[in-house]
Amino acid sequence: MEFCVLFGGASFEHEISIVSAIALKGVLKDRIKYFIFLDENHHFYLIEESNMHSKYFAQIKEKKLPPLILTHNGLLKNSFLGAKIIELPLVINLVHGGDGEDGKLASLLEFYRIAFIGPRIEASVLSYNKYLTKLYAKDLGVKTLDHVLLNEKNRANALDLMNFNFPFIIKPNNAGSSLGVNVVKEEKELVYALDGAFEYSKEVLIEPFIQGVKEYNLAGCKIKKDFCFSYVEEPNKQEFLDFKQKYLDFSRNKAPKANLSNALEEQLKENFKKLYNDLFDGAIIRCDFFVIKNEVYLNEINPIPGSLANYLFDDFKTTLENLAQSLPKTPKIQIKNSYLLQIQKNK
């Protein structure tokens, strides 16, 4: 089976997506037929496999590549010989952050009937917004930490709105990769941390920070009616997983398995199933959990994890190919114009 990797995007995680695509190239190798790069101006470009390395993208603004146009079933390439359709194999949406995880690309791909692996529109909207993710989890009976949502209008009242004490953690509500995330241990650090978070999002989420909390990551997908899980990872961290810890090492081959009881592993999987069903059908996602006093709490849902979290799976290639055979299908609406014909008949 062949794939097309779509990466880049107009987001703060643009470079992360490039590194993610390069890492996935090393895993899938010749199974990737095309690499399609989306730049910050929303132009699509075909990148040769030999150019899939960091040095090329560090200088890509100096390149003169012919832009492609997204159309039904593929991409349109114009040349002096005329227009040519590049028919795409199954697309892997590997655009992190805005464009890829907020629903824009899912909408485009569905609109043009291009088959893809990745979160659909509703899944993207709910998981990209951390506050909406918490509401979604609560409705499913999955625990989350206490939290406060701030915007520019109420940020001055942050301390009054919180029902928890220092230390706490501040996160942009619409950004991933730990960008703009800071731990605040005393009041004098608050303004700086808020300024940093508001650079990435119009809304900011504040949660209590629990030193030394156990954190577990679990990736997976649903293939037909059965779930396929990765093994559980317990990430090595200091205070929290910052940008460098999260993304500058996801090209690793394998991550260490967590040492946890069968009962706890089953709890993590049951919570994952609740969150996945059926919203995330067609996607490989990673759920990051906290365990506090033997209770499982959702930290966040990563709808497009770095390099699709391939390093957590014992047989990632088989998982991906099986998922490709179990993608959700949008029913085609038959337009019959019977109502219009009846109106015409009655005239």
Curated annotation (Swiss-Prot):
This is D-alanine--D-alanine ligase. Keywords: ATP-binding, Cell shape, Cell wall biogenesis/degradation, Cytoplasm, Ligase, Magnesium, Manganese, Metal-binding, Nucleotide-binding, Peptidoglycan synthesis. It comes from Helicobacter pylori (strain ATCC 700392 / 26695) (Campylobacter pylori). One of its GO terms (molecular function) is ATP binding. Its main location: cytoplasm. It is an enzyme of class 6 (ligase). Residues 134-332 form the ATP-grasp domain. InterPro entries: ATP-grasp, ATP_grasp_subdomain_1, D-Ala_lig_Van_CS, D_ala_D_ala, Dala_Dala_lig_C, Dala_Dala_lig_N, PreATP-grasp_dom_sf. Mg(2+) 2 binds at E300, N302. The keyword ATP-binding applies. Its EC number is 6.3.2.4. GO terms for biological process: cell wall organization; peptidoglycan biosynthetic process; regulation of cell shape. NCBIfam families: D_ala_D_alaTIGR, PRK01966.1-3. Binds 2 magnesium or manganese ions per subunit. Signal peptide: none annotated. The keyword DNA-binding does not apply. Belongs to the D-alanine--D-alanine ligase family. Its cofactor is Mg(2+); Mn(2+).
